Amino acid sequence: MRRWWGALLLGALLCAHGIASSLECACGRSHFTCAVSALGECTCIPAQWQCDGDNDCGDHSDEDGCTLPTCSPLDFHCDNGKCIRRSWVCDGDNDCEDDSDEQDCPPRECEEDEFPCQNGYCIRSLWHCDGDNDCGDNSDEQCDMRKCSDKEFRCSDGSCIAEHWYCDGDTDCKDGSDEESCPSAVPSPPCNLEEFQCAYGRCILDIYHCDGDDDCGDWSDESDCSSHQPCRSGEFMCDSGLCINSGWRCDGDADCDDQSDERNCTTSMCTAEQFRCRSGRCVRLSWRCDGEDDCADNSDEENCENTGSPQCASDQFLCWNGRCIGQRKLCNGINDCGDSSDESPQQNCRPRTGEENCNVNNGGCAQKCQMVRGAVQCTCHTGYRLTEDGRTCQDVNECAEEGYCSQGCTNTEGAFQCWCEAGYELRPDRRSCKALGPEPVLLFANRIDIRQVLPHRSEYTLLLNNLENAIALDFHHRRELVFWSDVTLDRILRANLNGSNVEEVVSTGLESPGGLAVDWVHDKLYWTDSGTSRIEVANLDGAHRKVLLWQSLEKPRAIALHPMEGTIYWTDWGNTPRIEASSMDGSGRRIIADTHLFWPNGLTIDYAGRRMYWVDAKHHVIERANLDGSHRKAVISQGLPHPFAITVFEDSLYWTDWHTKSINSANKFTGKNQEIIRNKLHFPMDIHTLHPQRQPAGKNRCGDNNGGCTHLCLPSGQNYTCACPTGFRKINSHACAQSLDKFLLFARRMDIRRISFDTEDLSDDVIPLADVRSAVALDWDSRDDHVYWTDVSTDTISRAKWDGTGQEVVVDTSLESPAGLAIDWVTNKLYWTDAGTDRIEVANTDGSMRTVLIWENLDRPRDIVVEPMGGYMYWTDWGASPKIERAGMDASSRQVIISSNLTWPNGLAIDYGSQRLYWADAGMKTIEFAGLDGSKRKVLIGSQLPHPFGLTLYGQRIYWTDWQTKSIQSADRLTGLDRETLQENLENLMDIHVFHRQRPPVTTLCAVENGGCSHLCLRSPNPSGFSCTCPTGINLLRDGKTCSPGMNSFLIFARRIDVRMVSLDIPYFADVVVPINMTMKNTIAIGVDPLEGKVYWSDSTLHRISRASLDGSQHEDIITTGLQTTDGLAVDAIGRKVYWTDTGTNRIEVGNLDGSMRKVLVWQNLDSPRAIVLYHEMGFMYWTDWGENAKLERSGMDGSDRTVLINNNLGWPNGLTVDKTSSQLLWADAHTERIEVADLNGANRHTLVSPVQHPYGLTLLDSYIYWTDWQTRSIHRADKSTGSNVILVRSNLPGLMDIQAVDRAQPLGFNKCGSRNGGCSHLCLPRPSGFSCACPTGIQLKGDRKTCDPSPETYLLFSSRGSIRRISLDTDDHTDVHVPVPGLNNVISLDYDSVHGKVYYTDVFLDVIRRADLNGSNMETVIGHGLKTTDGLAVDWVARNLYWTDTGRNTIEASRLDGSCRKVLINNSLDEPRAIAVFPRKGYLFWTDWGHIAKIERANLDGSERKVLINTDLGWPNGLTLDYDTRRIYWVDAHLDRIESADLNGKLRQVLVSHVSHPFALTQQDRWIYWTDWQTKSIQRVDKYSGRNKETVLANVEGLMDIIVVSPQRQTGTNACGVNNGGCTHLCFARASDFVCACPDEPDGHPCSLVPGLVPPAPRATSMNEKSPVLPNTLPTTLHSSTTKTRTSLEGAGGRCSERDAQLGLCAHSNEAVPAAPGEGLHVSYAIGGLLSILLILLVIAALMLYRHRKSKFTDPGMGNLTYSNPSYRTSTQEVKLEAAPKPAVYNQLCYKKEGGPDHSYTKEKIKIVEGIRLLAGDDAEWGDLKQLRSSRGGLLRDHVCMKTDTVSIQASSGSLDDTETEQLLQEEQSECSSVHTAATPERRGSLPDTGWKHERKLSSESQV
């Protein structure tokens, strides 16, 4: 409809009945007056608009009585005067533009397989409800919402997603509803030692850290790297390690992920046609203020006065001045626009015919004639255009207009015809094509998963999850397969389209596979790799892999195939960005585009449209071109921050964007109709449209027999080519060789590669091996086609066939740095050097029968080679004295052959023909050779090699690898000349060999029955040519051929990171690592159970005690909590117990061998206990104490009869052992540097060995003592009787700790507890007089002295950073026991629910509230979002509610105990709320607030009737607890350093304890007050009545936080909410005299009632399978009381009130404003109603003022301050002032942040607490006697006149007196008790110790503050 011009309404009169009368309308002379409307409106239009065929008046009055133009007899006359062809009548198209040609048409009957549209069209039935508007009027998409299955979650918008996507951290619903109200996710477990943890928690191999690749997906693995892999020439290295084009530096675009390419740049200058963004980037000036954020910082859209462009209807013309006129008024000779923009010369108007009318000769017009303003105007039929003469008509070629037809177009005279390719069908609009088949699905990689989404429905499903870093993607529709590449794993994988059967396709030789494409016709897989700069091809299963293109490739990225044309297309964004193409066999390579490209990412082909589309992330553009590169055009050039991948389907483009994390779509022709398909994705990468028509059928050039090819058949144009896998030679035109006979084999750390000598290109390919992390040494055995390699990352030696099959680990234990490897192909032996252990070892080629050959005088041995003909082996050693040595292959006849002019002798090689030894020296930069005995030394290549490493010989050539040039080179082996480079740009080159089949045969006696050896037969230079030997630690018997069965006597010792054994059965000492597959970080103490053959050890870093079999199997942790520094450990093999000392906790404990029934034996007067030994037969245990007063002690093995044996002349008593044969005690002292001995009672003490440098562990076996020494890093031995004959057992062992000597042949002693555990229910422990029964820590032994209680009854529960512990109050030891709750990080507050036995706690590191059972099971997150710093927590055990304070958000909230029904109770006038406590029986809620105005407040449990109890003389009120018996509150003040109490009304305030250091939390039980103290790191207690009898319950505990008491007497009582939740549907809150029902802040989908017992009806009817609608957050809290009747309201969904609810009085209809008709006046009744309303309000106010005046007579004078707040009100005894004097400087300095910690340095550990927790330096000064304070509970009172005051206190605290009565009684006795100050504050006395905060102590006077 045209805009309305002229006057609209002159006026209207108002009457009492609201009826308007109209005036006569009169327009000017130049205007036409339209008919008066029913509303009395007058409309004037320009006179020239009359009789122009347009309904300008709106009622056709301007067209009534007009003569319409005539139509020819062949045409149809439309109602609006338009003439159309009669054949167009009733064809379903609105050709008249007023639908008159489609009126009164007989209805068309649709076929059975068609759907009838409402506009009369018929479409295919399968198009109904497919998401496409096929009818044109959207009637085919008016569909019922699809029902979600049982395994799906329905989003709020109705779409369905997988059920397990709910609350998974990813926004899968388009509206984000799947991530609302979710518990917090459990943090990712920490990575192990060999892994690196990415910023978002994922673990990758540590070798990927700082390797230049984005393995994490967010570049966090490449940040903070001290050294980066260098970028290529022409590239710029970002700070994160990413390499980009150097031309992108300082260009205004942040191309680096960390924006480092735009730092320190001079201001860029933009041209006159460009706009400079705030970031410095230049964009087109025309993009300024166009509504699109082209700058990416929105600076091009700022300060735009009018960003919206005027819009006109499709049949209108937009004038330059913004007016809209009808298209018919163009070029009519009249200035309709008013600015002449509709006429010449602004418009190309046709000349007029000059005829007077259309009745004569059709006005001179060739087709149509019409009279316009009295003149003839010619027009043409649809399909024609008027020519220059203004008379004749010319055919319009619609096919020339791009996008006029979706696919094919045929032009006809006056018309056109669109047609579609096979597989498509023309839509009813006759122009667009719709693909036949199933509904299209967008398949995209999301880094961590692969998902699919329906583009028109928002249906979103998961295909594959738990991926590492999925980038590229493609599918094979016919075979129902999906393929993807993972750039973290460097692999290509595939799976079925249903997500099943995941398997690896290509697992080796990949570095950065960024592009992937499937040839669905010939079943081939193509991919690009920007790391290797290659394009490769293979079968769909990865077989027959071939490097297709590798020359002149830099960084190939996207790839697309056209199998029907046999063409491959790819993008390359190296230094010369381009798009290229070639045949699919690699031939016919050509450039498609190489200009105006920077970062061409995505690439796709429109097969039906015969075009290609690509995205450029640098230019922020989507472009298209023909397949030959012609007709290139930008489709979208703005609003594209970082497009990555693109796909096309039908007429739409779909692309992913990294910056917006979204999938978008637009029209493929125009770029218009842009739409966000999905956003808030994790990291969208590649994308494809999953549909059969995206892979149309094509001719398979290879046919059914693979083209007759033996391996690969690759299409090439319209033909094909047979090709061979890389390295295999072609025998003829169709066949390839089946094997490789000779090839160059080299290691490249991450893979092992080969270069075939059978082909001319010498391109390398990867042997497909798994899990190669850091390969160094290589060798091979052609007899079984095996390749062997060492890996210094996994510390393994492995082997596989040369084709990668049969891979297996050969040696995987006791390796540290296997640097050299050699195969004896004669005896099938494997030799290797280990630079970490400094050994040369040998084993069978399968790794069995391993033994140490040489272990002495080795210093970093490197390469090794063998010469079986002579029986010698040769190795290089490049330690402090570099040398080359040789020895017999059985270790005999060892000698140094080269020792001078060597620096880093690396690779070795033997020329068996000329008997020469070659070596490469990286320090000397030479390659040299000499005779096998070291003679005739000569330099082959000197001072010309940057860094040679690996070396090998073959034929007449020598080959070597070079680290610095990253190349493989060769030269003549005799002269060193004729050098050539075989391969370059190869990172991390290591060893090199040539695999061939011409090794010389050698005869040996070992080939005949193994030479008669029982185990190993080795070649030797001795006359027999061989010798027998045994595996390490096993003795060779006298026959020289047979080995003993195993170790009987051995040493076992801890070396921090492993446990090792040294056999004592053999004449030499060699340590063997116990192959325990567990992480060890700081293994200290060790013990052995010879009965079961198990070793036990403690790890003081991991804080655990573990055990395993001596062969490394059956490993397990037995103690994982409550350990700090377990320095000593002893196994009672007879009594089946394990004992240990803990220097951190100063305890000695015992437990069963599996860690159960743990008990603290000794805990008093211990100061760093260390070593411990047992004497079960005597019932004694002995230990050393390393503290300030070092000593040796003894007690019974049950902790009884404790005695100090020696306490003088001791320094650091470390190791300890008992000699049972001589009844002596031996110990090692690292300070006195002596090993001493004494009798078992401490007598006859004397020195045995002196000096010893730093002995640690000590043990004894037979006649010798053995000890470890930190200083010498060795194990020593001496005679146990004399201390003489000291020898070195093993050296070069850093990290030596404890040691034990074991003889498994020795018999065990008698078990004192017998076979029935002494009749004890739990522990039976030996003692000198027999045994005693004992219970686990904290549990009492019953009266029978045999049986234990099941669990403690009353105990303290407290938090300490990463732990929750308990202390039993039933026993006297008061030792803490860890509650085994997993995943604790920084626990602050906690509480307990005695009903279900669960502990609730807050973790401020994770910002969650969780709960768990006391045994650590059933841990779950209760509140997982919307928290900042939850410092206080309280459980309402009656109403089953949970309360908490949030210091970060300054709120107090509540929920059900399961976290549901969450509601904010108080969120105003809070400033750092801290502790919180509830009194369910009274309906009270208490909390502390220590913001600028510290205070303690109280409210009802619903937050109402808020009252400030105390706000004077407060500093930092931390902890808060209630004494439910005496009805008093207790709190600790960390600023004033005291503990105080008051009654429940804040009256009768008393200081209980002063001069406490830094109290944090407190609790109460019986007559005791317990509190935690940060400064003293202890839990203490005092008498709650007197404040005396102060005791330390637990000391030396870091990070103490909250503390509570769990007792049957603690959580008692009930209230109205205790029965059936008070009848409430959601929340029930008890109050002082009533209770209320309340609704959560966020609706949970269930109707909420505020009336007890009433369940409101659903707001609308729903089907059984349909979920109820979500209720809005509009439900207030409503009071329910037996004495008060309150009107209630209930709102339904969407805020609507049903009629039934309104009739019940549950709610009221909202007053919706109804807009009046134009010109209608206000009704008089409205004014009267308004006056009555005002009068009513005044009456209410007057009544309220009168009521308050009367009420003030009976209330406390201080309660006059009533402050209204929402949602409730609070009353305050005193006015709350927001301004206060600033706290002293120490306040700010000691304010706790989340990053702080309660220690002096504030940097040791990170505690996540926000300004709600304070740390105050203080001393342990004595607290005063509080002389001014007296209590009636503490004894007789000196002044009996104060007895009444105390009586008032008791009555008030019990609740029998209200506030007014209490105040009156206190005032009566004020004069009598004036000398008693119940809130006195004693003065501090004494000086403060130096704690590190001495000069920042709290100010002592108010004036200083």
UniProtKB/Swiss-Prot annotation:
Where it sits in the cell: the answer is:
Cell membrane
EGF-like domain sequence ranges? 354-394, 395-434, 698-737
Provide the disulphide bond pattern. C27-C44, C34-C57, C51-C66, C71-C83, C78-C96, C90-C105, C110-C122, C117-C135, C129-C143, C148-C160, C155-C173, C167-C182, C191-C203, C198-C216, C210-C225, C231-C243, C238-C256, C250-C265, C270-C282, C277-C295, C289-C304, C312-C324, C319-C337, C331-C349, C358-C369, C365-C378, C380-C393, C399-C409, C405-C418, C420-C433, C702-C713, C709-C722, C724-C736
Regions that span the bilayer: 1726-1746
Repeat (LDL-receptor class B) residue spans along the chain: 480-522, 523-565, 566-609, 610-652, 653-693, 785-827, 828-870, 871-914, 915-956, 957-998, 1093-1135, 1136-1178, 1179-1222, 1223-1263, 1264-1306, 1397-1439, 1440-1482, 1483-1526, 1527-1568, 1569-1610
Keywords per UniProt: Calcium, Cell membrane, Developmental protein, Differentiation, Disulfide bond, EGF-like domain, Endocytosis, Glycoprotein, Membrane, Receptor, Repeat, Signal, Transmembrane, Transmembrane helix, Wnt signaling pathway
The PTM entry states: N-glycosylation is required for cell surface location.
Name the family the entry cites.
Answer: Belongs to the LDLR family.
List the protein's name: Low-density lipoprotein receptor-related protein 4
Organism this protein belongs to:
Mus musculus (Mouse)
